[in-house]
Amino acid sequence: MNAIRELLSFGSVVVVATCLTSIAVQAQKSSGSSALSGTSWQLVKFQGPDERIFSPDDKSKYTITFGSNGRVTIRVDCNRGSSTWKATAKGELQFGSWSRTTAKCGARSLHDQVVTEGAAVRNFVIKDGHLFLSGMAAGGYYELEPVASGKR
């Protein structure tokens, strides 16, 4: 009888531990836990599929912040947007549907290039402290640097 109680007690502990582990793993996945989690970046340059390079006149007008809660916010010149994000250890990056403002930006704006190509980003890598976003079908990539503390 004691052996049965001990076996049942042990079985209950295993079930509870398994459930808690599963909950912790799901929470980690949904919070966007990765090297990007809790980071903010500003655009250094965009190289288009035709290998032309575009650099912003003001890096602080082109920023992206990956929240640790699975949300992402962007500033693309005179517009702002938000979505959800997920990343894998293999460097795959996925965004949900974007909601954003649609103001008409100035003549020297990179808004149209960033919005058009940015929607197709599928991969990321952090190299030498810079974030590189790529994976667009037509080619090209974004290079971003960390936003200095206090400038988000």
Named regions from a protein language model:
Residues 4-10, 19-152:
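Lipid interaction determinants
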Residues 14-15:
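Repetitive helical segments and hydrophobic/amphipathic motifs
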